[in-house]
Amino acid sequence: MIVVDWHNGLIFYEFLWDGENRNLRKLGLKEHIWSSSPLYSEEMKKLRKKWFRNLKETEGFSAKALLDFHHNAGEGSRDYDLIIDRGFLKTQSISQVQNSEKELRFSYENLINKEFTEDYLQLRA
């Protein structure tokens, strides 16, 4: 889980559980990609990091580019691409949060029933 604190500057915290241990750490202000420890081998995680670095170098991290990355990144393997389908285990959804001076935008796409929801929280009048 990632926690973002906008009230005390911009601070990111990462809460990880690897199936055995829980860890909380403060993150630096740079880009990160996460892969569920119980679901992916170290080799699969390295591939995902490679795809993420490639995105940064070729398209950058706009909201549109990141959403497209979550839909399409991979090499055609339903076992370890960003959208997985291992039969019994499938990617359920894609969520995105965008913060601007005026609002916080949250979008949620249910990949199972193809529903898309978008909500806004106005930050300043």
Give a label for each model feature:
Residues 1-125:
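N-terminal nucleophile
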